[in-house]
Amino acid sequence: MTPAAPDAPATAWAVEPSGPLRGEVRVAGSKNAITKHMVAAVMGSSPSTIHNVPDVGDVGITTEVLRSLGVGVDLDGDTITITPGDGIVPEVPLRYSGLNRIPILLLGPLLHLHQEAFVPVVGGDRIGARPVDFHVDALRAFGAEVTETEDGVRAKVAGRLVGTQITLPYPSVGATETVLLTAALAEGRTVLNNAATEPEIIELALFLQRMGARIELSPGRKFVIDGVEKLHGATTRLEGDRLEAFSYLVAGLVTGGQVRVGGCAQERMVTAISTLQRMGAELDINDDWISANAPDGLRAIAIHTDTHPGFMTDWQSPLFVLMTQAEGMSVLHETVFEDRIRYPAMVVQAMGGEIELFETCLGGPACRFHDSNAVHSAVVRGVSELRGAHVEIPDLRAGFSGVIAAAVATGSSVIEGVHHLERGYNKPLETLQSL
């Protein structure tokens, strides 16, 4: 696996069939946690320090966004220090439009600082519709006046944001983050019902507690936050990236090898581990490492993605490739993001994967997309003989699927668009080359 030939695009890799991938990978901190911690640190009255920071593109983008606001950001190896300072401005420049979804999370913190804020249109992976309605509705519940324009979202408030009671229509991770960040400095008590409780959400809540926030998690997806007058800086170490850990375990299994993954605690991987076991994988687990192999081959499975503690939606892309190497007919039902399933399917189909897509709910209970036209279920027939191809990957998660599919395929592949991988995986090229 190498950068592609000189006449190929700069963001392309040439991938030859690898044979069994074997070795050890120690994952860094969670890509889905680090950027939210960086936003939280903006609200502190003193610097915050975060350790075990992954070397991913989203950290670079968020660093640029924060610096454009006047926030000090210093990255030293895998440690980042955020220094809020007194000169923070309330508007994220339009040049950061569409790069990732972090700007929308800045609305609450900027409103606390300036009583007004503007963020440009957000971006992120191509995984179907990802409207900002839940964020906007939550901010309005706190008393903000919010206006959506073609360029972005503008908000203002007269005085201080006020605690409120919010019940999310769906346990959205992003909306839960917006509420936690906004409620921490709001006047009075906020009660958030039907909240997301993913490990990265709990990490954010714990970091805010270290900064002085008063946050309680109650049974039944309920957060209670009592707003405080001021937050201070804090120090924390990020937990390992569970998506990256699963991806490398799957890379070993897909190629008939065995990858040993460290840096991600077992409790963050419970549903991933049980899913691999159902497919016939043998897991070796201790306090430091998780490894998986399948000496007797892989079995087909029916599974649906879900909010935590269910099977993580980000895990479905590498699972697609694993299903092509499992004996029998597998079913995958995506219930979190409409149309997300199209993108990894498109990449794997280009390499010969036998995949049929459906608009109906298969492999699990009926979901919120059951009466829509969204493609959100797939049937995957295995074992498929994948073949090398020239493919362009559309997003981060589908990108890793393309790379590991190319590793097990017959013949050479060129994978374009690997900048998507570098946005979310920690040093992916050198990590894969080490296996």
Feature roles, as predicted:
Residues 1-435:
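Short, structured segments at the rim of ligand-binding sites
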